[in-house]
């Protein structure tokens, strides 16, 4: 296994704001979609589509617009890595 950095990855820090709706580690316990187990590519594409308005939403467009494309990439990489780290 690759050696983990002692510092917390930026994507993990940025992902903390997602937990309020999507649950800890993206495991939602409500009608809000679970993002745990989704690929980084899927999450990044969805967030970029929310940001551009290509994907309709109630609140996700506003959330996604608050992040740079690089931050969206980091968030997606973090969530995409969770299911492989925990298996």
Swiss-Prot record:
Matching entries from Gene3D superfamilies are given as: Cytochrome c-like domain
Q: Name one Pfam family in it.
A: Cytochrom_C
Task: Give the keywords, sorted.
Answer: Electron transport, Heme, Iron, Metal-binding, Periplasm, Transport
Under the heading InterPro entries, the entry gives: Cyt_c-like_dom (IPR009056), Cyt_c-like_dom_sf (IPR036909), Cytochrome_c_Oxidase_Subunit (IPR050597)
PTM summary: Binds 1 heme c group covalently per subunit.
- Give the primary localization class: periplasm
Subcellular location field: Periplasm
> From the Swiss-Prot or TrEMBL record, what is one GO molecular function term?
metal ion binding
What are its GO cellular component terms? periplasmic space
Q: Where does heme c bind?
A: 18, 21-22, 60
What is the role of the protein in this entry?
A: Monoheme cytochrome that function as the electron transport subunit of sulfide dehydrogenase.
Quaternary structure and partners: Dimer of one cytochrome and one flavoprotein.
What's the name of the protein?
Cytochrome subunit of sulfide dehydrogenase
């Amino acid at each position: 296994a690759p050696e983990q950095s002692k510092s917390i990855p930026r994507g993990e820090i940025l992902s903390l704001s997602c937990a309020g709706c999507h649950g800890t580690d993206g495991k939602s316990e409500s009608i809000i979609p679970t993002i745990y187990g989704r690929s980084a590519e899927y999450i990044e594409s969805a967030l970029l589509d929310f940001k551009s308005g290509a994907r309709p939403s109630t609140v996700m467009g506003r959330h996604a617009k608050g992040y740079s494309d690089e931050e969206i990439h980091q968030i997606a990489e973090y969530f995409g890595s969770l299911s492989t780290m925990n298996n």
